[in-house]
Amino acid sequence: MESQQLSNYPHISHGSACASVTSKEVHTNQDPLDVSASKIQEYDKASTKANSQQTTTPASSAVPENPHHASPQPASVPPPQNGPYPQQCMMTQNQANPSGWSFYGHPSMIPYTPYQMSPMYFPPGPQSQFPQYPSSVGTPLSTPSPESGNTFTDSSSADSDMTSTKKYVRPPPMLTSPNDFPNWVKTYIKFLQNSNLGGIIPTVNGKPVRPITDDELTFLYNTFQIFAPSQFLPTWVKDILSVDYTDIMKILSKSIEKMQSDTQEANDIVTLANLQYNGSTPADAFETKVTNIIDRLNNNGIHINNKVACQLIMRGLSGEYKFLRYTRHRHLNMTVAELFLDIHAIYEEQQGSRNSKPNYRRNPSDEKNDSRSYTNTTKPKVIARNPQKTNNSKSKTARAHNVSTSNNSPSTDNDSISKSTTEPIQLNNKHDLHLGQKLTESTVNHTNHSDDELPGHLLLDSGASRTLIRSAHHIHSASSNPDINVVDAQKRNIPINAIGDLQFHFQDNTKTSIKVLHTPNIAYDLLSLNELAAVDITACFTKNVLERSDGTVLAPIVKYGDFYWVSKKYLLPSNISVPTINNVHTSESTRKYPYPFIHRMLAHANAQTIRYSLKNNTITYFNESDVDWSSAIDYQCPDCLIGKSTKHRHIKGSRLKYQNSYEPFQYLHTDIFGPVHNLPKSAPSYFISFTDETTKFRWVYPLHDRREDSILDVFTTILAFIKNQFQASVLVIQMDRGSEYTNRTLHKFLEKNGITPCYTTTADSRAHGVAERLNRTLLDDCRTQLQCSGLPNHLWFSAIEFSTIVRNSLASPKSKKSARQHAGLAGLDISTLLPFGQPVIVNDHNPNSKIHPRGIPGYALHPSRNSYGYIIYLPSLKKTVDTTNYVILQGKESRLDQFNYDALTFDEDLNRLTASYHSFIASNEIQESNDLNIESDHDFQSDIELHPEQPRNVLSKAVSPTDSTPPSTHTEDSKRVSKTNIRAPREVDPNISESNILPSKKRSSTPQISNIESTGSGGMHKLNVPLLAPMSQSNTHESSHASKSKDFRHSDSYSENETNHTNVPISSTGGTNNKTVPQISDQETEKRIIHRSPSIDASPPENNSSHNIVPIKTPTTVSEQNTEESIIADLPLPDLPPESPTEFPDPFKELPPINSRQTNSSLGGIGDSNAYTTINSKKRSLEDNETEIKVSRDTWNTKNMRSLEPPRSKKRIHLIAAVKAVKSIKPIRTTLRYDEAITYNKDIKEKEKYIEAYHKEVNQLLKMKTWDTDKYYDRKEIDPKRVINSMFIFNRKRDGTHKARFVARGDIQHPDTYDSGMQSNTVHHYALMTSLSLALDNNYYITQLDISSAYLYADIKEELYIRPPPHLGMNDKLIRLKKSLYGLKQSGANWYETIKSYLIKQCGMEEVRGWSCVFKNSQVTICLFVDDMILFSKDLNSNKRIIAKLKMQYDTKIINLGESDDEIQYDILGLEIKYQRGKYMKLGMENSLTEKIPKLNVPLNPNGRKLGAPGQPGLYINQQELELEEDDYKMKVHEMQKLIGLASYVGYKFRFDLLYYINTLAQHILFPSKQVLDMTYELIQFIWNTRDKQLIWHKSKPVKPTNKLVVISDASYGNQPYYKSQIGNIYLLNGKVIGGKSTKASLTCTSTTEAEIHAISESVPLLNNLSYLIQELDKKPITKGLLTDSKSTISIIISNNEEKFRNRFFGTKAMRLRDEVSGNHLHVCYIETKKNIADVMTKPLPIKTFKLLTNKWIH
């Protein structure tokens, strides 16, 4: 019997199988409460007899036979004897009898004396203590109550028995706790229903069906008082009774209301957890239903957030809606409303495909009605709690009492009071509850509890010889590590943590103690009946109590599910601390392996396959029970989600169904996959797979090409392998019709070997399903393995081979066996496997020297085919080796740095699993082996030396007063393996030779200098050089040694070519700042520098005056001092507080030379001549740090798990050379096609607007006679070169209007069809800004015009034809163009010539020379941008006259006449302008940016702290090797194009303060590394945060009527790649910033002065052109000024000495600058660096400095 019952429940873990021996009951579908009267009578007699025998004759005891169970036990058994409890005396599950009135007649069950009542309530006989039913009530159970919900169909015999014998019904249990009152009142109501008093029970509306009589009220009152003692009543019940102690009806009514509310909540939760939707009902109804449920739950205090609600809704979607699970599963912030928008879209698409009726949304009233109509359309599949019984004579089982006092314990004898519209769901276990659902009657299945545990109870077990418990809270006198061997029914060891005493305090106030074992590895807490019998305690299942031999009742027994339980409330808690026992060492052999670890170990196979494999022993070494499966259902492997993402499943059963049956290895499937691009030549590009039809055994072989001889070699190999290893001959090979299979060579080979080739039918790849599915599975595994391990892509075939080994060992759910078992091979020993990419250390048996490290970091790939070793990849050697000499490298950090979830580490599990294969390095000896020299065929990476030996440089401790970390060096001899880096390094393309990776040796003779620390914290690249060495306190004299005489401070004329050194500033967290560095002249610098070439003339020492003007001879009547003041006046320069002079300490007056070699692209101002951080500079202030965003940089740090190697020396490579096989980049499309805007547009309103715009465009085309409508041409008659494709494009303008445009495909236009010399001119942005500035100063009126369909006014000269759009139905016809259609190469130039001719001839305008599209006459100025015109004039009537002339020829619209004197708002060429004539003008783009930036999909942080500056000083763009797949590269380049394109548009329009950052990042569009993208995101975030900023202009108030044009220039020396300098200029007109420029110098400058000269020379041409434009538009005199903060540059401009120019390039630049300054009457002025607003154009600045320089003109 025991073995039979154990076999029925194999899934129960340790101890649970034993627990089912004596307490498990035969499975029945009958209600335990539903007991017929006849059986109660029989039971009463048998029970009375048994009780009387037990009372009078203790020496004998009999158990009545239970007619409900087929028990092999005899009806009577001997009484218990002294000593252990006999096994045959225990009540088995089949001997458990229902209990009746005699049970409740026991004195111990009625501790309270009944209240006095009428004698009619007492039955005959003085011993009865229970009330008798009044005669008016009738015989209990004789007729069912209509409200009870149960009907009984009794046989005639049953009727006679009921009428004659039944006098009592089963009463409710005693109320023992206020928390149990809700459950107790249900049983009490059931008791009243069974007593034919159901009519007096209040209904839902609070009123009974019939009035209650006095006798019934008395009966109600007394029974309530008996079974519900006052001390256990809830407070609200006591409050009712305090008012009227007889008002039991009110208590029942309120209880029913509470139960109804709880039932509704439970039903709502169950309905929400079991939603189903497939589109069969309207989406509106489904949405209304769900939202109503969520609203009700939220109103009742059960909050359902968006994430949980969306998961529940998506889980119930099926059919065409199922794909939403996959498209939406990564949207973490998705709302229910957004999800229903997608559901509505699919539903409307379905309806649209079924009929042509338009879809519409219903009004709210309709939705409410629908919610009632469709409430139960998705009713879950359930089993009703109390179905109606059809046969009352069937055997029933009595229900035991729930004596648990726990509020969370489920009630085992309560029924639902009323039914709800939604049936309760059946749960297999309590873990199926969702959303905090309580375990109520509506969720518990009382007929199947094989897996349920009754919380707070001990399970009675007669088969267990020892008591086992999981919690340590009740163990007394515990001792650890007991030497006890305990096994379960399957003979498996149960680990025991401790042994102690379990102490009981029973109802008779006696205390008893038994021995107990502590273990967490059991399903239930087991109470051994054998140990209870040893202390004279027996279990009486007749009365369901624990009692002593003298009959003393100790505790009730509760039957729950199939087992019997005793409450833990009788246990005495102990004072032992839980960690004392829980921390006891558990044997490693018994600890369960976590499922994620096994999932990764077995090549990321699914849980079902792994369980099948373990059950069938296809995977050996451990069993299914050794794995913790608790997380298998909900576990989501991110690597699987990424690596195995797919569009749809392959069609099942697509293989030929009627093929012949073959023996193993007679029928093979084969297919070739490839090629894999962008791999080194040594790596395979293809693989060929074979699958046996019968066993499903797989083989894979690498291929480098698909040539005939390569394929033939593989076929020869596998056929020989099958013949020798399996003694089988291949008969048929199925393959596709690729040329590699259909060639003559292979065909002859197959024919020679007697093999039949079976080819798939043409264009039917599905017929080749076996091979196709295998390739897909292997590729999914490959991507997942590479994603999880981080290994380089050229190891892809190793991942394929690892997956094949594991897949051959996993059991198939259909066959229940693995391919290895089918093939007759042993199962795979998992202890011989390592996770793919597992970091290991390989022993180097032949090191370079005796002191060289003996371990080489590597990554395990797969078991070797040719030995007992393992294939391991060694990144440092660029090869794979076959070896057994390795140890596993343990790491405690997250393996998956790309995901934001908990780290997974399995070091202990891996150690246990591979214990027999672990160590090869002993503490006293190292066993050397020659295995390392065995190179396998997996050596896919050629040997490239990327780590040349570098000289070691020792850094002095005095690097910086704030540096406390000692310097470190990285060399080849000091490599260390970081435990925090689990991922493998991404390798560079081995085909890139050393010559194009390493810097050219001819470029500089500077010795190589290794890094002193990695660039892990933000990309700072520090050099291993003695920046600051300790100096003597005394001043040293000048000597011939440069190392003792050079000053660390600024030297403008310092020559790198002659000294082989480069100035490098000291790094600081606060960026660069030179406010504490005193200015020194070139002469002073020259005195401190020895062995240098002759320099230029130096200026005399400068004073501390804020403005210094250099006198230049110019024909002006104004004094030079007044000219300087007039130029400086009104400029938006920052106001600086006075500063006290800073003195240098003596030790730093003389510093040694600084040697550096810097090639990084910088956002931090490397080598900046204008900003240095001195030795006594302070840290950045809180203002500088408060808005700094911490972004990850893909440099070598703890979060970058791509490398286990030390940081390499930075190597500059060409941007394009870093990307493999890069092709053309498609332009970004922002418009819609015809099918997108109209044909398949789901938005009905938008579609209608596009249709309206389409008809408007067609009418305009016909009106303008765009083509010849008189004749249509055949396509064959026209030269294809002259045929232009055409299409409609649609877009939505910023003002909300929808526009359609018919355009020609000019991108594919033949060059012979247009004149490449024609130009399409538009107004220059500087011209527009100049015109706007002059308009503000001169109180001009500004009028904005638009010419509709401007291009169509221009005739076309060439003979061109276009194809009509496809929807017009003229596919074979052509039409000849007559007008310049939009999109043609020549259309812009044709329109420009047309409008230019009209403005000059008809409007009396003339074009300003050198400034295209700027027209003027004596009164009006016009700026033309294609079809937009901006008119400026002092008299508004002048503008109106021009407008009238334009309307005579063109369809001209007045966008804004500009006649108001108040503030007027314009939208001119993307600029949002606020203009109040004579006062101010504000230029911004807030609305445009608010609309455009969110569409870029940039991770914005709108609620976080705002950035104070667009970038951080000291950050460098690390341009190491960039290895990306082509698709990934294109996607990132496209993203960079969009982001930098928008930033450039904003920067060159008005945000000139951003131009440096934009220009630097624009140089890296083709190098989209993670660091570049992070910096770009930071820039976009800053633009978003400051989108409301505006360029502010105020009307100037000059003393004299002159215009003042000023350029402020600056340069940062050598801070760009290849030592290029960054130059910047800002142009101001009358104190208003009208433009700016930031760019990298085209030539390499050799000093800061040369960089400043280059910057000034770049600004002068545009300054002269602007001067000419201003004089043409405004006839006032003009003063031109040039401001710089380089005094040495000023001295060069004014000097007449040409002897000291260091080279020809420098001299020619300087001489040209002198000529330009003198010839153009430029006033050159000095400006302090701290006031130089052009500083923002050349380097990133600290937040405080950035704000100081920009807040006067951008705010």
UniProtKB/Swiss-Prot annotation:
Annotated Mg(2+) 1 binding sites: 671, 736
PTM characteristics: Initially, virus-like particles (VLPs) are composed of the structural unprocessed proteins Gag and Gag-Pol, and also contain the host initiator methionine tRNA (tRNA(i)-Met) which serves as a primer for minus-strand DNA synthesis, and a dimer of genomic Ty RNA. Processing of the polyproteins occurs within the particle and proceeds by an ordered pathway, called maturation. First, the protease (PR) is released by autocatalytic cleavage of the Gag-Pol polyprotein yielding capsid protein p45 and a Pol-p154 precursor protein.
Ranges where the record places region Integrase-type zinc finger-like: 583-640
Swiss-Prot/TrEMBL keywords: Aspartyl protease, ATP-binding, Cytoplasm, DNA integration, DNA recombination, DNA-binding, DNA-directed DNA polymerase, Endonuclease, Hydrolase, Magnesium, Metal-binding, Multifunctional enzyme, Nuclease, Nucleotide-binding, Nucleotidyltransferase, Nucleus, Phosphoprotein, Protease, RNA-binding, RNA-directed DNA polymerase, Transferase, Transposable element, Transposition, Viral release from host cell, Virion maturation, Zinc, Zinc-finger
Leader peptide range in chain numbering: none
One Pfam match: rve
Catalytic activity reported: DNA(n) + a 2'-deoxyribonucleoside 5'-triphosphate = DNA(n+1) + diphosphate; Endonucleolytic cleavage to 5'-phosphomonoester
Binding site for Mg(2+) 3: 1610, 1652, 1685
Region described as Disordered: spans on this chain: 1-93, 126-173, 352-421, 956-1087, 1092-1111, 1130-1187
Annotated binding of Mg(2+) 2, by residue: 1346, 1427-1428
Ranges annotated as biased composition (Basic and acidic residues): 1038-1053
A Gene Ontology cellular-component term: cytoplasm
InterPro entries per the UniProt record, alphabetical: Aspartic_peptidase_AS, DNA/RNA_pol_sf, Integrase_cat-core, Retrotran_Ty1/copia-like, RNaseH-like_sf, RNaseH_sf, RVT_2, TYA
Residue ranges annotated for the RNase H Ty1/copia-type domain, each copy included: 1610-1752
Function: Capsid protein (CA) is the structural component of the virus-like particle (VLP), forming the shell that encapsulates the retrotransposons dimeric RNA genome. The particles are assembled from trimer-clustered units and there are holes in the capsid shells that allow for the diffusion of macromolecules. CA also has nucleocapsid-like chaperone activity, promoting primer tRNA(i)-Met annealing to the multipartite primer-binding site (PBS), dimerization of Ty1 RNA and initiation of reverse transcription.
Other information: Retrotransposons are mobile genetic entities that are able to replicate via an RNA intermediate and a reverse transcription step. In contrast to retroviruses, retrotransposons are non-infectious, lack an envelope and remain intracellular. Ty1 retrotransposons belong to the copia elements (pseudoviridae).
Comment field on protein domains: The C-terminal RNA-binding region of CA is sufficient for all its nucleocapsid-like chaperone activities.
Descriptive protein name: Transposon Ty1-OR Gag-Pol polyprotein
Gene: TY1B-OR
